[in-house]
Amino acid sequence: MSLWKKISLGVVIVILLLLGSVAFLVGTTSGLHLVFKAADRWVPGLDIGKVTGGWRDLTLSDVRYEQPGVAVKAGNLHLAVGLECLWNSSVCINDLALKDIQVNIDSKKMPPSEQVEEEEDSGPLDLSTPYPITLTRVALDNVNIKIDDTTVSVMDFTSGLNWQEKTLTLKPTSLKGLLIALPKVAEVAQEEVVEPKIENPQPDEKPLGETLKDLFSRPVLPEMTDVHLPLNLNIEEFKGEQLRVTGDTDITVSTMLLKVSSIDGNTKLDALDIDSSQGIVNASGTAQLSDNWPVDITLNSTLNVEPLKGEKVKLKMGGALREQLEIGVNLSGPVDMDLRAQTRLAEAGLPLNVEVNSKQLYWPFTGEKQYQADDLKLKLTGKMTDYTLSMRTAVKGQEIPPATITLDAKGNEQQVNLDKLTVAALEGKTELKALLDWQQAISWRGELTLNGINTAKEFPDWPSKLNGLIKTRGSLYGGTWQMDVPELKLTGNVKQNKVNVDGTLKGNSYMQWMIPGLHLELGPNSAEVKGELGVKDLNLDATINAPGLDNALPGLGGTAKGLVKVRGTVEAPQLLADITARGLRWQELSVAQVRVEGDIKSTDQIAGKLDVRVEQISQPDVNINLVTLNAKGSEKQHELQLRIQGEPVSGQLNLAGSFDRKEERWKGTLSNTRFQTPVGPWSLTRDIALDYRNKEQKISIGPHCWLNPNAELCVPQTIDAGAEGRAVVNLNRFDLAMLKPFMPETTQASGIFTGKADVAWDTTKEGLPQGSITLSGRNVQVTQTVNDAALPVAFQTLNLTAELRNNRAELGWTIRLTNNGQFDGQVQVTDPQGRRNLGGNVNIRNFNLAMINPIFTRGEKAAGMVSANLRLGGDVQSPQLFGQLQVTGVDIDGNFMPFDMQPSQLAVNFNGMRSTLAGTVRTQQGEIYLNGDADWSQIENWRARVTAKGSKVRITVPPMVRMDVSPDVVFEATPNLFTLDGRVDVPWARIVVHDLPESAVGVSSDVVMLNDNLQPEEPKTASIPINSNLIVHVGNNVRIDAFGLKARLTGDLNVVQDKQGLGLNGQINIPEGRFHAYGQDLIVRKGELLFSGPPDQPYLNIEAIRNPDATEDDVIAGVRVTGLADEPKAEIFSDPAMSQQAALSYLLRGQGLESDQSDSAAMTSMLIGLGVAQSGQIVGKIGETFGVSNLALDTQGVGDSSQVVVSGYVLPGLQVKYGVGIFDSIATLTLRYRLMPKLYLEAVSGVDQALDLLYQFEF
């Protein structure tokens, strides 16, 4: 073999070995694992925990990668490749899944990257693939990425894609639980601000007119070439749920749907549906990114942002961006408005036509309407370099008269000429003509005219007629201004007082004024200002002469006269003042006399004096007899005295000090200070030293104490208050008796509090002040009167603390009740100005409900223990709570309880932003099981749900109602609605109503309830509406004994409550019953109560007949009642049918008209029966007087066998009944003794003797 052949053979073998090695490493599972192991060993910072499977099912677990500034953790990576697609010249990836991914990037720790030279633009980029690429499924599960202060979190993401040639198709995609937490802009700005070492001079800003001229001299929309996208994109369906962005604003998107495609520059938006916390958006449309850029977009939105909550927006955009663009907007809801606009963005000058129309506009948008604009029409036509503007509307509102506003104006990019602004109101017109120019400085020239203004009709208490003219001109430039009013005239009258204002004036931002004359006149009262405050000289006089202010203006009264003079120069001014006023009155405020005298000069030093005396200041709850203020001296030595005499505050203080102009420092002393207040006198125990340093902007306040008979507040050390400082305040004693004047009569408090506050601040540094506050109570007791009973609450320990340090606020408390439990806890808020994260705990230990027993009457009590162990989490916007609250052994016995409660328990478990409730209410008969849950993950849309189920729970409302109920009800609550649904079965009940109290009187429909101020009370309405839908089933063992009716009830009722009120639907039947009235024993043969609406308006269908055993001739006679409850219709019927007179005779007498019995005897029996029926209450009261319970007088029998019977209980189990015949005088004595609850022994003695054993059955 030749050398060439050997070399060729060796090369071939090497190539085959290389290819075989690559094939082994890539194509086999063992080789692939070997590759990952090598990468784990040789790649710095890479750590692969576990590798399983091959290309068809490859899984990497516990993967980590760390480099300076970069840390990546991956719990699980899965890749499944469809190798069979390679035979078809395509790439198929069946699955690419990432789970539990954690990425942290700190750009400050990363090494600086090398600067990459920008590549030259080589023309449009085309992306295409020579082989089809299919990614069947890509999934992200629990992915968290943090880049500096920005956090991105994805809970679940699934998608797929297909890339063939130039078309990329995104398969149906789902994204759930996306959170993007952005840093606040203010925080980023603070981090990025760096003080420059050298101040570079800034070029002068262009005037606004020149800036606008340059802006509109060329098209707003620059020349645009056709946009060439590198590939065609088709998003079949993108769904998102619970997407949230936080930062300076918090945006939550509940659901989102996107369908869009872009083929060769033609973009089509099939659907964009967004449901977020700010509102709902639905959009669709098309756009072409070439030629004239035609667009056609439709958008509908409903806002959920105050004050425009519920606002509906409809937007339609059509035309072309490079030709004419047309926009239409329709607003409905709090704001109703139509906007139509046409513009050409690609044309210089920005041609623009805008029309705005609205039938009515209100302010505020929600709640009570304070202002209203009707028939608003606004029109803008032309270009921004030459446009006309017009507006028409009518306005009205609170405290403003109805007016019609008309505006006509013309303008360009450098000025606007207000041809006329007319406000037609108060039977006159107000017109404004003006020119506003901003070519160089902002300058104006205007003329305001008042013509025929008459307020008599709109404001009858302040009638006036006014005419006037005001001319003004001025300019504003570089932070300075100047103004000139060459003419100011106002004439007319106010409440028959002549009004005259005449004058001219001019001034500037340097407070230099020239006032040739300004005269104000109102009736006999006048004021005049004349002079100038020049650059150097000061010569200004102001005089007031008001001998008759009474009724000059509504609520004004008194007299005033005075003079103020300003003389000297700017360097050495002098102020002279002498003003006297008497009998001043304004609305409810009155002042008997005011006297002001002053003479202040400023040469090398400011010196002078000022005396102010005010007598008899009076207004509701305030009565000050005298206030005097006296100040005199110079800069070097001056003093001030203040004296106040009156109620509710009186007192005095002295302030003396000196000022060093060179050092800009003032030192002083506050002394002789005391005040009388509603909580007692306060006085200083020592003088307060004051020191103000103007250069440092700092004041020092020396140690001192304020003393009160019930309190002492001290500053133990000097307070230096400035940009930075510290203050310590000690509360040495505070007796709660001080609060008595502010407490209601039903509340009393006693005890002593002590405490301390220590606060330090430094405004030159970021962050909040540092400080702490502590309060400790000793012998504290609060007594609250409830239902005329005192409820004392004594505190063994009462400590409160508050602290703010290291950007964390903390509130703590420990409250231990005497002979009872303890309530303690602490709440922390971290980063109060930023994220405001919550932490802490709340504990309740061995709190016994027996502490409220003093408010109960004899025989009533409460028992039970409350305990809790709760932990706080989350943040202020989304608070979280963990732990459990338990109430065990709770037993409340009282007349107000509808059942006999036995020891019961209730537990509430909190888990973050959700909670569950479980409990059992035990009674002597039956139990009620409570279950529920609550969710406040959306704090503005919280919800709660409670279910109650029970079986034959005995309900007792003495002395009338006993019943067994089986509830199965559900109560649900949201911020907008309370609902109560379910079913209540009443299988057994006994309802007994003997009579109503003699004092029971129905409330008149025209009763008006008054409050403590004798003002009508407004009816209380639920802040949250209540809806109910309850089914009440009345079983077969429900009986009623009321007002002579003894009957059994059955039926079903549907209790419905909504915004219309309470309603009943259903039917109550009376299958059997008896009615005793007016001596007659009637049997209810048919009874129906039909409910369909208000509960007090049932439809009656009742038939009651006389007892056939007490009716002769086998005749049935009765009464039929039909119709609504408030308008029933009663008729007498009989069987067989007969005349009304005969039927009435059988109903009342039990005999027909042709009966042989004596009419007098029958009438006697009927009258006695009627009388006895009406005397039941009187007989009962007589029996109670003699110790006989349930004494009753009744009649028995019919015709000649009629008897008057008296019965009563002489002993709890022994009943005596004595009957005497009305016509035969035969007496019958009956003794009945109860052996057992339903077993009786009865002995009868009369014409016949009998001894019976009776047993009572109930059906």
Swiss-Prot record:
Keyword Membrane part of the UniProt annotation: yes
Disruption phenotype: Loss of cell aggregation when adhesins are over-expressed in a double tamA-tamB deletion mutant. The single mutant does not exhibit growth defects but it shows a slight increase in outer membrane permeability. The tamB-yhdP double mutant shows defects in outer membrane lipid homeostasis and sensitivity to bile salts and various antibiotics such as vancomycin. The loss of tamB and yhdP severely compromises the integrity of the cell envelope, and causes lysis and alterations to cellular morphology.
Residues modified as N-formylmethionine: 1
Spans within the Cytoplasmic topological domain: 1-6
Subcellular localization(s) per the UniProt record: Cell inner membrane
Disulfide bond listed as a keyword: no
Transmembrane segments: 7-27
Impact after mutating residue 1102 to R: Can only partly complement a tamB null-phenotype. Mutation significantly impairs the assembly of FimD. Does not affect interaction with TamA
GO terms under biological process: protein localization to outer membrane; protein secretion
Principal subcellular localization: membrane
CC annotations in GO: cell outer membrane; plasma membrane; TAM protein secretion complex
Assembly description: Interacts with TamA to form the translocation and assembly module (TAM).
Note: TamB is widely distributed across the majority of Gram-negative bacterial lineages and is far more widely distributed than its partner TamA.
Annotated function: Component of the translocation and assembly module (TAM), which facilitates the insertion and assembly of specific beta-barrel proteins into the outer membrane. Promotes the assembly and secretion across the outer membrane of a subset of autotransporters, such as Ag43. Involved in the assembly of the outer membrane usher protein FimD. In vitro, when TAM is reconstituted into preformed liposomes, it can promote the assembly of several outer membrane proteins, including OmpA, EspP, Ag43 and FadL.
Protein name (Swiss-Prot/TrEMBL): Translocation and assembly module subunit TamB
Organism: Escherichia coli (strain K12)
Gene: tamB
